[in-house]
Amino acid sequence: KEKPLRETTMVLAVADGAVYLERRPASGIWGGLWSFPEVGDVGEWCAEQLNAEAIAVENWDTLRHSFSHYDLDIAPVVVRIDAVSSKVADYDDSTWYRPGDAPPGGIAAPVMRLIETLSNTDELRNHG
């Protein structure tokens, strides 16, 4: 039988060659792993969470990830941010990660794939 399908939007916030990652709650999928934030409204999230305005927003093709009980369609939204405000220093459960550096911990597989794709875009290459 067909597995149920769930959908989510993930923000791939990029600033100064780094991407914003959050540690997921211990319970639930990818418990305790680092991931891109799942959001409802991207612009709102940028303003509230990053205290920043998105300069450029790009919607990527949906990425499907299969779990044993359901499929998850991830809609990645790449958001370029001009400057990282002091409000979002690295906290225990969020960090600015530079691809190529040692990761802060375990990273969810589809997130790792998205980071690799991002690493090959001009957004991140120009800073290396």
Model region roles, listed by residue range:
Residues K1-G128:
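Intrinsically disordered, low-complexity, charged terminal extensions of DNA damage-control enzymes
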